[in-house]
């Protein structure tokens, strides 16, 4: 049996390294102009061709319609021998609810124990003290895995029309059947409704 070896050119690797360094230093991917300047090329098409190959081979993903919507995937990090990065996505409340913030503030390297799920994680900075008995304090960075599967007792990232919050998900066989529980007796439970959506499960505090 022949094992197919993954091939990446020097130029493609250089593009990945530039994107990685820019994520670390600036907190977002480089623009087309910045990439062309770093690579010393003038043609947009040349860069698009490189992106197409990298995307086809699952080294990166691209967000349609976004000039900076480039994400390095697990294979891409491996190709440049770099630690995977996770986005830090603003603030969310460990109190009541705060307005959802989707902007990425920065990118942070992941430890080896979570590298295998690098494509499906995000880091959230929390506000408030409703989770202090779970050792989550104001300003802490929490690593969440993006998922749709939860069990009672999970600490979750929950979204509603009012905003987002971090709480413990509780599901039981008596009323109230499902709710979000703070880990601070000064705060009330939040009853689960059809308008709520849990989008992440806590992996650990960073």
Task: Label each PLM-derived region with a short phrase.
Residues 15, 46-47:
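Helix-turn-helix DNA-binding helix
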Residues 14-21:
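Pre-recognition alpha-helix immediately N-terminal to the DNA-recognition helix
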């Amino acid at each position: 049996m022949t094992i197919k070896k993954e091939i990446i050119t020097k130029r493609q690797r250089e593009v990945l390294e530039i994107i990685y360094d820019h994520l670390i230093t600036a907190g977002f991917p480089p623009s087309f102009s910045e990439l062309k300047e770093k690579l010393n090329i003038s043609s947009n098409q040349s860069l698009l061709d490189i992106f197409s190959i990298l995307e086809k081979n699952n080294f990166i993903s691209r967000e349609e319609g976004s000039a900076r919507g480039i994400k390095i995937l697990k294979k891409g990090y491996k190709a440049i021998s770099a630690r995977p990065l996770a986005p830090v996505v603003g603030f969310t409340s460990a109190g009541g609810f705060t307005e959802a913030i989707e902007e990425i503030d920065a990118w942070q390297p992941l430890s080896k124990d979570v590298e295998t799920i690098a494509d499906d994680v995000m880091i959230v900075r929390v506000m408030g003290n409703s989770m202090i008995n779970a050792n989550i304090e104001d300003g802490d960075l929490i690593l969440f895995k993006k998922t749709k599967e939860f069990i009672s007792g999970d600490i979750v990232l929950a979204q509603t029309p009012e905003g987002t919050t971090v709480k413990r998900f509780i599901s039981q066989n008596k009323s109230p059947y499902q709710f979000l529980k703070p880990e601070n007796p000064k705060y009330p439970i939040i009853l689960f409704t059809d308008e709520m959506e849990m989008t992440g499960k806590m992996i650990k505090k960073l």
